[in-house]
């Protein structure tokens, strides 16, 4: 029905997670477009007329080279669906599926040979950055539940899932089963990731919005007013998504000592209490669009555009790439600091502001102390917050407004004697 398609499209274009992906991480957003396109070409397989496998094959190859994990999940769901409804497919069309699969596998084979090694390297990198990451098999159900949690909060409120069994949806069992199978299989495959981020299941966003649009339509099939009211509530607030979690949040806050026994449980507790909060991401998103966002590095870049000179050297203890590209300064790495040639500028905003330093940064701290002791530097405090991480396209940690902090960035300028910065 066209009205269901309209509802699904409206939910998608007003979805803040999807909008953030399309604006700031288009490679993450590509599966949002490719998934419904792939399923559209797949459904034509069940038509009685002669099936053309070329569109499905082309989209599948493109999809694999874009996001192979989500592609694997969608393909797995499609294969399960095809097995369940194989009786509806003609023998001639079914035989063409094998050829399409062989061509896709052949063109994707170069990547398939290196993926196991690549996944191991990625896993090693993440585990080296944090001791809280679970590398055992138990992470699979944990990650699956986490995907359900994030999806419930921002995409599809699972309190409405029982309405998929409405009598009006019985004729749509073929389509509903395809959408559900692909969603579950994407969640399952994505659980292999080291960290369960919503971006790893972005392919499910259009599928879940189609299911949600079906529920909205058939739940109030005879009342457009109630349909509009439900759509407005889903778009403008997270009340339906989060309200069922509020009692659980209140209980968790009263029993917080049970959840703070380990670092992992503590992080899970803080994430749950932060996310289970009534708010309007849609309103916050428009607040972001109507206010200029000032990142933690913006003021620093503007400062050196005015005061920095070409050829001057600079050491910054975090995110040096930004100044290397956007300023005239010559950047110095921490290991290259020496006493005979002190940098013209020193910026402390990240690693060296941390009271607990690792061995490498501790060595750099000793070098900086010696440089400050033997040279004359003027201290300048910029009206810029000390934030080591810039904004993120992940909705859970995205900042809709400019970050603030009581701690400011310290800039040190080497001078021959006492003088003021002009």
Whereabouts are the PLM-identified features?
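Membrane-embedded, lumen/periplasm-facing catalytic core of multi-pass transferases
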Residues: 235-322
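Signature aromatic-anchored transmembrane alpha helix within multi-pass, membrane-resident enzymes
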Residues: 58, 102-105, 171-172, 216-265
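Transmembrane alpha-helix segments characteristic
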Residues: 8-12, 60, 78, 96-106, ...
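Hydrophobic/aromatic-rich transmembrane helices and adjacent perimembrane loops
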Residues: 21-22, 28-31, 72, 155, ...
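Aromatic/acidic, Gly/Pro-rich catalytic loop(s) in extracytoplasmic/lumenal soluble domains
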Residues: 172, 216, 341-422
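Membrane-interface transmembrane helices that cradle and orient dolichyl/undecaprenyl
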Residues: 3, 38-56
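Transmembrane-lumen/periplasm boundary regions of multi-pass, lipid-linked membrane glycan transferases
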Residues: 65-66, 71-169
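Transmembrane-helix signature of polytopic, membrane-embedded enzymes
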Residues: 1-14, 225-228
């Amino acid at each position: 029905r066209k009205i269901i398609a309209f509802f699904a499209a409206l939910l998608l274009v007003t979805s803040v997670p999807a909008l953030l992906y399309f604006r700031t991480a288009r490679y993450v957003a590509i599966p949002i477009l490719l998934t419904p396109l792939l399923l559209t070409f797949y459904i034509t397989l069940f038509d009685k007329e002669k099936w053309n496998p070329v569109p499905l094959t082309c989209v599948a190859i493109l999809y694999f080279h874009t996001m192979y994990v989500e592609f694997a999940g969608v393909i797995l769901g499609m294969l399960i669906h095809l097995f369940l409804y194989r009786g509806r497919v003609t023998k001639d069309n079914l035989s063409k599926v094998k050829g399409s699969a062989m061509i896709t596998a052949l063109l994707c084979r170069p990547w398939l040979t290196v993926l196991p090694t690549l996944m191991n390297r990625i896993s090693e990198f993440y585990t080296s950055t944090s001791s809280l990451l679970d590398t055992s098999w138990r992470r699979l159900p944990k990650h699956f539940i986490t995907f359900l949690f994030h999806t419930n909060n921002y995409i599809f409120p699972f309190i409405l899932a029982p309405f998929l069994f409405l009598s009006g949806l019985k004729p749509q069992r073929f389509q509903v089963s395809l959408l559900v199978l692909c969603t579950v299989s994407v969640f399952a495959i994505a659980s292999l990731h080291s960290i369960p981020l919503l971006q790893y299941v972005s392919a499910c966003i259009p599928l879940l919005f189609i299911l949600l649009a079906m529920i909205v339509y058939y739940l109030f099939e005879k009342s457009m007013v109630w349909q509009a009211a439900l759509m407005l509530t889903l778009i403008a607030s997270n009340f339906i998504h989060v309200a069922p979690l509020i009692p659980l949040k209140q209980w968790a806050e009263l029993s917080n000592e049970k959840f703070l026994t380990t670092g992992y449980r503590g992080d899970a507790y803080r994430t749950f209490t932060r996310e289970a909060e009534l708010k309007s991401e849609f309103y916050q998103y428009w607040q972001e669009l109507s206010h200029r966002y000032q990142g933690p590095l913006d003021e620093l870049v503007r400062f050196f555009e005015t005061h920095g000179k070409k050829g001057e050297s600079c050491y910054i203890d975090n995110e040096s790439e930004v100044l290397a590209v956007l300023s005239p300064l010559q950047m110095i790495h921490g290991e290259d600091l020496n006493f005979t040639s002190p940098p013209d500028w020193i910026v402390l905003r990240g690693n060296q502001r941390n009271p607990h330093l690792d061995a490498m940064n501790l060595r750099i701290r000793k070098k900086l102390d010696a440089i400050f002791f033997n040279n004359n530097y003027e201290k300048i405090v910029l009206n810029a917050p000390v934030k080591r991480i810039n904004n993120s396209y992940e909705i859970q940690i995205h900042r809709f407004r400019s970050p603030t902090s009581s701690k400011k960035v310290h800039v040190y300028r080497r001078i021959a004697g006492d003088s003021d910065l002009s």
